[in-house]
Amino acid sequence: MLRLLVMLASIANCAGGLVLIATWATMWQRVPIIVLFIGASLLIQGAYTILYLRGDLDRWRDLATGALFAGEGLSAVVGAGGLIQSIIHNISNADMEMAPVLAGLLMLVQAVLALLFLLVTDRLRPRVNGRSAV
């Protein structure tokens, strides 16, 4: 069940990233370039997690798991920061912008779900000579 939730969150991240990239590409004169970078971040985060869950990165074993752990940890911090900042911005300004709130929420939720998946499936256990150290 958790695997399915992580997969759905990853697909949502890819879709959200593509929407932000397309928004910047079609209206680049009026949309700040940070929208492109946030969209690329969401797309990369979602795509890497999908590849990991499908087993396409199995040949990299612990390196792929470590990269997923590091990337999702960083995404959780950035997503939480973006979510908090966008909520504070919306509270202090009359114009409510929901896109930054949704982008931060997408990034944070997918990161937390992926980290929980790694923890629950016991993939973060240290290894010595190819075997579990614990």
Name every feature range the model reports, one short phrase each.
Residues 47-80:
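Loop-to-transmembrane helix junctions at the membrane interface
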Residues 3, 89-133:
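Alpha-helical membrane-associated segments of multi-pass integral membrane proteins
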Residues 1-4, 26-29, 56-66, 91-101:
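Juxtamembrane loop-transmembrane helix junctions in multi-pass integral membrane proteins
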Residues 27-34, 77-105:
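Interfacial non-cytosolic loop connecting adjacent transmembrane helices
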Residues 8-16, 70-78, 106-113:
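Alpha-helical transmembrane segments of multi-pass integral membrane proteins
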Residues 1-44:
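N-terminal signal-anchor transmembrane alpha-helix
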Residues 32-46, 69-72, 97-110:
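Alpha-helical transmembrane segments of polytopic membrane proteins
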